[in-house]
Amino acid sequence: IQSTSMDQGSLSEDSMNSLLRTLIKADIWKNKVSKQMAGTKDDIQTTVKKTDAEADAIENKNMRLGFQPVVSVDAELLRQQRRFSSPRVLLSENTPLEPPPLYLMEDPMVLNRTSRRKRFAEGKSHRGEYSVCDSESRWVTDKSSAVDIRGHQVTVLGEIRMGPS
């Protein structure tokens, strides 16, 4: 299962969850049956019932632990499920080229989804840039010239007139 951005359409979350459960159960069933094949019809039916119960138990355990298993999906099963499309998940026969981004799991904003995130403007970021000297929080009244933030000499006005006069 490979994550990507697709513009083909969206499914409800319940539909996608049931598809993923079906894929996981089918893969677990396929692997267990191929290992436990004894030959008789009764043995296969018993194995199917046992495997469904095991798949549910494994799924419940994994949900509690927050673990998402990596599964190999049969190509035929993928061809049958082509009608399912999602903007977040792409079912593919190929393995992903890179591992999932783990840095998202470490980000505190991802872990705490109830907190509000500060918006930022597009473009150049000034993160980590601080002024060299501390600012002063007092009025200066005896200055007639100063240096602005670009390093240019400027005249300080003693009085500012506003409105018509």
Curated annotation (Swiss-Prot):
Source organism: Ramphotyphlops sp. (strain YPM 13663)
PANTHER family per record: NERVE GROWTH FACTOR NGF -RELATED, NEUROTROPHIN-3
Propeptide regions on this chain: 4-119
Protein name: Neurotrophin-3
Glycosylated residues, chain numbering: N112
Record key words, sorted: Cleavage on pair of basic residues, Glycoprotein, Growth factor, Secreted, Signal
Function: Seems to promote the survival of visceral and proprioceptive sensory neurons.
Pfam families reported in the protein's UniProt record: NGF, NTF3_N
GO molecular function, one term: growth factor activity
Compartment(s) where it occurs, according to its Swiss-Prot or TrEMBL record: Secreted
Sequence similarity: Belongs to the NGF-beta family.
SUPFAM superfamilies in UniProt: Cystine-knot cytokines
GO biological process, one term: nerve growth factor signaling pathway
Signal peptide range in chain numbering: 1-3
GO CC annotation terms, alphabetical: axon; dendrite; extracellular space; synaptic vesicle
UniProt keyword annotation of Repeat present: no
